[in-house]
């Protein structure tokens, strides 16, 4: 129980400390006052070691330098690169110890690893290097590598920690135990168990070896193709690691290229399917277009025929309408003004009738007789005869008086026939002079009456 508690405390302390605090870790373990191992009684060998002066030894110097220099001067670049890294150059990037496989030595027992004594368990040595404990071959029992147990009950005089319980008939298989240097290096990772799990994930233990390199079929093919042979045991050199990373990068590139080609093929297949569907649809549309063009041509022919028929009917109707319009216009201009009830009456306008002298047949006869009488030789000498004129005017039976009355009667009859007798008479009297009326009513001597008749006839003509 005490052993497990001490081991758990030491593991937790190693996990919580950084590599820089290596001195504090040693103080935490071996301090007399507050150390974890202060209650553990050391063997006689440790007491003699205190009293005796330790002689310088190159092995002990290497051990001390590895312990003291691991926290202060860690190597700037790791000797191995992470397993999942892609880069061929591993010197520039620091690596996590949980991704780096621990170095393993050959299958034979090194100088620092001593065989187990009879009756005692496997021993752990503080000598720097690999601490693989070897026992006699026997039945193998697989023990998880993540569990680290250290028995602190007994210290051997030689400075080795040995278990008290006797060896079982079944021995443990060869496995890699952790040294103080591994504990110090594992402090930077933060988890000792993850370190072992990561190493066991990348590598697998082989028969008689601590670790074995596992290659896939593709990696083996590429290595054989390039003529490169990698060892099956770890650790690998930097050149071999770069070659392995290069091979794995080629495999990843090949897989990505295959994926891209697959996607490209699927895309091209989809495009070809769409193109075939579009081609079929295009052909169907072309057939429809040809059918529609034929229908359009037939409709255009029918439209032309209809336009010709409409033009002919329109010209005929226009001619008929023109004729009818001309007839109606002529009828309106010629007939309507004559029958219009609102038009002015021509008979009522005073300007339509002009005064005209009308001579009766009697007057013409009298004038002709007078002209004939004046032309006979030996007629009466001309001269005024006022008495005779007066007598004629006064006597009612004289021919002058008869002519005057007949002229007045004829004028009255003619005015009664024309509906406007008074107006015609007035115009006639105004047109005739007073002298002419006096001459007609009371003519003078025969010469004067004949001359007056000729003048009247000349005026009439």
From Swiss-Prot:
Stretch list, region Basic motif: 245-274
Annotated stretches, region: Disordered: 51-120, 370-408, 442-461
GO cellular component: chromatin; cytosol; endoplasmic reticulum; endoplasmic reticulum membrane; Golgi membrane; membrane; nucleoplasm; nucleus
Segments on the Lumenal side according to the record's topology features: 344-461
Phenotypic consequence of residue 166 to L: In HYTG2; uncertain significance; no effect on transactivation activity in APOA4, APOC2 or FGF21 promoter-driven luciferase assays
Keyword check for Repressor: no
Subcellular location: Endoplasmic reticulum membrane
PTM text: Controlled by regulated intramembrane proteolysis (RIP). Following ER stress a fragment containing the cytoplasmic transcription factor domain is released by proteolysis. The cleavage seems to be performed sequentially by site-1 and site-2 proteases (PS1 and PS2).
Ranges annotated as biased composition (Basic and acidic residues): 386-395
Similarity annotation: Belongs to the bZIP family. ATF subfamily.
Related illness: Hypertriglyceridemia 2: An autosomal dominant form of hypertriglyceridemia, a disorder characterized by elevated plasma triglyceride levels. HYTG2 patients also have increased total cholesterol levels and low levels of high density lipoprotein (HDL) cholesterol. Reduced penetrance has been observed.
Name by which UniProt lists this protein: Cyclic AMP-responsive element-binding protein 3-like protein 3
Native source organism of the sequence: Homo sapiens (Human)
Gene encoding the protein: CREB3L3
């Amino acid at each position: 129980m005490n052993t497990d508690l001490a081991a758990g405390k030491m593991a937790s302390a190693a996990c919580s400390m950084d590599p820089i605090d290596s001195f504090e870790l040693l103080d935490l373990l071996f301090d007399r006052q507050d150390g974890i191992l202060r209650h553990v009684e050391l063997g006689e060998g440790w007491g003699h070691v205190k009293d005796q002066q330790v002689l310088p030894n190159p092995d002990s110097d290497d051990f001390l330098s590895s312990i003291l220099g691991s926290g202060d001067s860690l190597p700037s670049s790791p000797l191995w690169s992470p397993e999942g890294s892609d880069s061929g150059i591993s010197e520039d990037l620091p690596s996590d110890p949980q991704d780096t496989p621990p170095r393993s030595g050959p299958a034979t027992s090194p100088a620092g690893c001593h065989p187990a004594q009879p009756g005692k368990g496997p021993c752990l040595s503080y000598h720097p290097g690999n601490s693989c404990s070897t026992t006699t071959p026997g039945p193998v029992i697989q023990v998880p590598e993540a569990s680290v147990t250290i028995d602190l009950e007994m210290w051997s005089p030689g400075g080795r920690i040995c278990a008290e319980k006797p060896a079982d008939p079944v021995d443990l298989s060869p496995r890699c135990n952790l040294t103080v240097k591994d504990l110090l290096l594992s402090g930077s990772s933060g988890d000792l168990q993850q370190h072992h799990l990561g190493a066991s994930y990348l590598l697998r233990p082989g028969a008689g070896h601590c670790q074995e390199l596992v290659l896939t079929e593709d990696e083996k093919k590429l290595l054989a193709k390039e003529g490169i042979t990698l060892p099956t045991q770890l650790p690998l050199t930097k050149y071999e690691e770069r070659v392995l990373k290069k091979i794995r990068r080629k495999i990843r590139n090949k897989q990505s290229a295959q994926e891209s080609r697959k996607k490209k093929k699927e895309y091209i297949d989809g495009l070809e399917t769409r193109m075939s569907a579009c081609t079929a649809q295009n052909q169907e549309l072309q057939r429809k277009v040809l059918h529609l063009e034929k229908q359009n041509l037939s409709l255009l022919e029918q439209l032309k025929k209809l336009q010709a028929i409409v033009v002919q009917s329109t010209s005929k109707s226009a001619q008929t309408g023109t004729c009818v319009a001309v007839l109606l216009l002529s009828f309106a201009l010629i007939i309507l003004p004559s029958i219009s009830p609102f038009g002015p009456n021509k008979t009522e306008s005073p300007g339509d009738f002009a005064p005209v002298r009308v001579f009766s047949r009697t007057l013409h006869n009298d004038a002709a007789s007078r002209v004939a009488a004046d032309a006979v030789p030996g007629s009466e000498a001309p001269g005024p005869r006022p008495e005779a004129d007066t007598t004629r005017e006064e006597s009612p039976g004289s021919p002058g008086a008869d002519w005057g009355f007949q002229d007045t009667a004829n004028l009255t009859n003619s005015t009664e026939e024309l509906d406007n007798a008074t107006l015609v008479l007035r115009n006639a009297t105004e047109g005739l002079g007073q002298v002419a009326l006096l001459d007609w009513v009371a003519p003078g001597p025969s010469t004067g009456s004949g001359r007056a008749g000729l003048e009247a006839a000349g005026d009439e003509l």
